[in-house]
Amino acid sequence: MTNQTVSPLFPHRHLLGIKGLSPLDILCLLDLAYQEIAVSRQPEKKKSVLRGRTQINLFFEASTRTQSSFELAGKRLGADVMNMSVGNSSVKKGETLIDTAMTLNAMQPDILVIRHASAGAAALLAQKVGCSVVNAGDGAHEHPTQALLDALTIRRAKGQIENLIVAICGDVLHSRVARSNILLLNALGARVRVVAPSTLLPAGMADMSVEVFNSMEEGLKDADVVMMLRLQRERMAGSFVPSVREYFHFYGLDREKLKFAKPDALVMHPGPMNRGVEIASDVADGPQSVIQQQVEMGVAVRMAVMEALLDPRRNPGNGEPA
């Protein structure tokens, strides 16, 4: 990876997942996101690259931070941004996702950002509309921009991703964040571990090129990055953990468990956090935490994704307005 030249061109119409992206595609987005950071830190946080373009955010699942991040990203690029409130939409009256897609397509948007509880919803939408589609999370399938912002955060702090030991800990079973991160980190040459109780591990982990641990002590040993996952109790249909208190005792990241990792290990969390469940407050707010940097990198990455998809200089085959 280190000797390959990264092209400024992004040869995709949609961003539906990390799966399907080459390592060079990923690096293209990360390199562009570096440039977007500078824009966000200027007094006038604005570019005109997407002036005249229309972005519709279609969130079937509530997510204040992700939706706000996409909205801010679009506005900083100069796009006209519309947030569609699903709670007040025809979806609540029985309209299907395909019906919604056809209706939105008739409005001639340039890009649709969708979050949905069903895996594959973004891919289905992409088949039905004439504009670009960005997956902001579909069920337990993927969350590509979260993985990209995590990679950007790691790369800025550590200078590289290749050969780093990254431990992903917690509710892996229900986590689209874990899946996308595993795909991306493997693509860029990291050594990926997952740490979780057996009840929170999906089948087939061995096929994803990761090391699996049921012990935090073993899984965090010499880790460069500790990525905690939220315990997603709203997605749990059965009894996956005996109690929240017991879960924190064995799998919550506190100062004592963090000592198993390298002294300069990064602490990450995609948010929202359950303090005292998967992570202790003094660790979340401690000197090794880069959780707030992840939020900042999220805006930069989403700016990069939309610019890569819609700017004709970066995507000649997909750069004309819809």
UniProtKB/Swiss-Prot annotation:
Top-level taxon of the source organism: Bacteria
Protein name: Aspartate carbamoyltransferase catalytic subunit
GO biological process, one term: amino acid metabolic process
Family listed: Belongs to the aspartate/ornithine carbamoyltransferase superfamily. ATCase family.
Reaction equation(s) it catalyzes: carbamoyl phosphate + L-aspartate = N-carbamoyl-L-aspartate + phosphate + H(+)
Keyword Transferase in annotation: yes
Keywords, in A-Z order: Pyrimidine biosynthesis, Transferase
Binding-site list for carbamoyl phosphate: R65, T66, R115, H143, Q146, G271, P272
MF terms (GO), sorted A to Z: amino acid binding; aspartate carbamoyltransferase activity
GO cellular component, one term: cytosol
Record InterPro entries: Asp/Orn_carbamoyltranf_P-bd, Asp/Orn_carbamoylTrfase, Asp/Orn_carbamoylTrfase_sf, Asp_carbamoyltransf, Asp_carbamoyltransf_Asp/Orn-bd
EC annotation from Swiss-Prot or TrEMBL: 2.1.3.2
Assembly: Heterododecamer (2C3:3R2) of six catalytic PyrB chains organized as two trimers (C3), and six regulatory PyrI chains organized as three dimers (R2).
Pathway: Pyrimidine metabolism; UMP biosynthesis via de novo pathway; (S)-dihydroorotate from bicarbonate: step 2/3
Pfam families from the UniProt entry: OTCace (PF00185), OTCace_N (PF02729)
Main function: Catalyzes the condensation of carbamoyl phosphate and aspartate to form carbamoyl aspartate and inorganic phosphate, the committed step in the de novo pyrimidine nucleotide biosynthesis pathway.
Binding site for L-aspartate: K93, R176, R230
Top-level enzyme category: transferase
